[in-house]
């Protein structure tokens, strides 16, 4: 059924199709036509959290937490919403989202378009979702990069009571200079400030909410080693590898290869896995990794687990394969676990 729906959706503008799909999913959910499945097929512990299974939804699909309940009915082990910023912002001018079906890729330069952290919290409070919910936080475009920590601290404080875990997004290529925060000194200063605030908030709220950081696939081994050193030294709870790539050489002479933005889907698969493997080697089991990037079928999820991830997230694969991808990943992980025995 989804291949037919995809043909119709792919005839629409990519961003319009995105909103139409989520609105339709929400309507079907509210009509009770989506059977809520727990999918406790492969429970796993992640950052101290009990996941019913290790296949999660990556940030970016539901930026404002408007579709949490409907997405929660699709069998994910956890859901991540955002990226959210302190204040609402429109993001970059349209068009800013492009499909590259010949390569099973997506290019986006959305620019953290969202309604702001306060609106997101209102949506979370209206939700009935009781599963593991991650909130992905970023900085406003107008905030100077030297003041970025202020924005992350605002979001952390406001999101803390409503999140199962919080992800610090420093790897989007669509906010000017954001990726500079991945550098050693800048990264250390930012994460130390956030860990200090986390400790204060844990005392105030009487609960510990884990902090993860999301990194880019466009890193060399020295940069990956530096990041691994920092996240271990500040005692981050987890790391997400990876975001989208700015390298579009895999698209060859495709007309969209010159578009600005981050490329996701199948073209980022190898880059993401390379970073994941190197990161796992340098982290040496000190904190868990969530693998994301280029999971287009079940065996891709199993490969990320073999490379060192504790859990995985999907996004672009959902656009191309539909919700059935979740079950396909879970089946592949189960087969992989059996073969390893």
UniProtKB/Swiss-Prot annotation:
The keyword Membrane applies. CDD domains: DHOD_2_like. Pfam families: DHO_dh. Keywords: Cell membrane, Flavoprotein, FMN, Membrane, Oxidoreductase, Pyrimidine biosynthesis. GO terms for cellular component: cytoplasm; plasma membrane. It catalyses: (S)-dihydroorotate + a quinone = orotate + a quinol. Substrate binds at residues 63, 108-112, 169, 174, 243-244. It is an enzyme of class 1 (oxidoreductase). Its EC number is 1.3.5.2. The keyword Cell wall biogenesis/degradation does not apply. Pathway: Pyrimidine metabolism; UMP biosynthesis via de novo pathway; orotate from (S)-dihydroorotate (quinone route): step 1/1. GO terms for molecular function: dihydroorotate dehydrogenase (quinone) activity. Monomer. Belongs to the dihydroorotate dehydrogenase family. Type 2 subfamily. This is Dihydroorotate dehydrogenase (quinone). It comes from Neisseria meningitidis serogroup C (strain 053442). The lineage of its organism: Bacteria, Pseudomonadati, Pseudomonadota, Betaproteobacteria, Neisseriales. The gene is pyrD.
